[in-house]
Amino acid sequence: MNLVNNFSKLFPRCLTTGLYLWSLYAIVVCIHVIRARVVLPLVFTIAMVALYTYAKLIYVGPGTTKEYSILRVYDLNAAESGFELPPEMLVKRSYTQKRNGRFRVCKSCSSWKPDRCHHCSTCNVCVLKMDHHCPWFAGCVGYRNQKFFIQFLIYCTVYSILVLILSSMEIYTWFKGEFFEVELINFTLLSLWLLALVVSISITIFTVFSISQVCQNQTTIELYSLRRYNEEVAFLNEFSNEPIKGTINIFDLGKKLINWEEVMGYSLIEWALPISRRPSSLDLEGSHSHGLFFNVNKNVSKTMNESVDLQDRLLRRLTPRSSLDVDRSNFV
């Protein structure tokens, strides 16, 4: 089992690294339309920065609840029954709870789950501000490494587009010179072009999506959770004379730049280079750097709290089961 787990982690990492190194080799061997002294330094620099960011993305990790002893649950039954309570500082600054109003707890990790924290069944840990599990580096994207993940995507996009342009120019020159009449096209060049074409299209789409998520201060999990929650609200409204408003992301601070800075940092250097994000004066007593608490949109929070009673009354009217009791922002 350990051998299988190790292979499943090493294979995508070796594959990604290998593709970068092979593409560099292919560029050196096949690209002649532009002088090597002009192309190679630029391509090599982008590739090395991307690989360094990739390594840092893996090394830093997403951050987990196991790193904080204060989140440990000593008796799961007592926690589920409400006899063991989460740390007071966690309760005061948290906005997401279970449908029955109790604080979220992970039975697998025996730990309390802060806002935006979710259990990854593949990694078997609770990840702080979990975005998704990425198969391309066999790990999770979370609070600590989300910045490096976004930067890696940007570097990959720039690199793949640059390689596509160079290989396309080389193939165009080959056709224009009518070399196809006397020789077959270089297989390595053709492979490089096809790889660059596929990767540049797919990675560009995913990069744009990921950046838009950061600008909304929203994780992939929260995106689908919000959709599901609003669908439930729409269903409940069919039976109500007092419609409940759908909700929006409570962590969206209202401006794209502010949301971007929450993840990527507060300076151009932090945005461009794979360096750790510096805390700011907006952080909640330094806790924001730990991934346990997050700044929220006060207007959204106020609106959501005002609608709780109405939603709770409607749910109780539709069913007597307490499992459907809703407290605060249960959309996550």
Curated annotation (Swiss-Prot):
Record domain DHHC: where: 104-154
Keywords: Acyltransferase, Lipoprotein, Membrane, Palmitate, Transferase, Transmembrane, Transmembrane helix, Vacuole
Compartments, record wording: Vacuole membrane
Residue ranges crossing the lipid bilayer per the database entry: 14-34, 38-58, 148-168, 189-209
Enzyme Commission designation: 2.3.1.225
GO molecular function, one term: protein-cysteine S-palmitoyltransferase activity
Entry PTM: Autopalmitoylated.
Transmembrane listed as a keyword: yes
Lineage top rank: taxon: Eukaryota
Catalytic reactions of this protein: L-cysteinyl-[protein] + hexadecanoyl-CoA = S-hexadecanoyl-L-cysteinyl-[protein] + CoA
Residue intervals annotated with topology Cytoplasmic: 1-13, 59-147, 210-332
Primary enzyme class: transferase
A single GO cellular-component term on record: vacuolar membrane
Cross-referenced InterPro entries: Palmitoyltrfase_DHHC (IPR001594), PFA4/ZDH16/20/ERF2-like (IPR039859)
A Pfam cross-reference name: DHHC
Lumenal side: 35-37, 169-188
Topological relation to the membrane, as annotated: Multi-pass membrane protein
Note on domains (UniProt): The DHHC domain is required for palmitoyltransferase activity.
Protein family per UniProt: Belongs to the DHHC palmitoyltransferase family. PFA3 subfamily.
Function description: Palmitoyltransferase specific for VAC8. Palmitoylates VAC8 at one or more of its N-terminal cysteine residues, which is required for its proper membrane localization.
Name recorded for this polypeptide: Palmitoyltransferase PFA3
Organism: Candida glabrata (strain ATCC 2001 / BCRC 20586 / JCM 3761 / NBRC 0622 / NRRL Y-65 / CBS 138) (Yeast)
